[in-house]
Amino acid sequence: MVLGGKAVAGKGYYYPPTLLLDVRQDMAIMHEETFGPVLPVVSFDTLEQALTMANDSDYGLTSSIYTQNLNTAMKAIKGLKFGETYINRENFEAMQGFHAGWRKSGIGGADGKHGL
């Protein structure tokens, strides 16, 4: 753990941004759905390896890929088993859009005219 990892003192239930380095695929953080500002950093050699690692979970709410190559982004979108995949940005929820998780990340969807 490089940053964060301890609850903030005081009123409320706040958790600081947390950065985890040297994360391995067999660690729970790679398989559980974490709602919080926690970023596990994992090394990979190929896009296929990264997709396999990302999909190695029962959950699939949202994913992001950062790349300068449009072909790489499109391959990632097709290969990731997530309800939403963002390119070169973090999770952003536009209320006009329909949002849905995949696998154990929820049933149905929310927002937009189809989510009402």
Which residues are covered by each model-predicted region?
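Short secondary-structure junctions
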Residues: 1-5
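Conserved C-terminal structural/oligomerization subdomain of aldehyde/semialdehyde dehydrogenase
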Residues: 7, 14-116
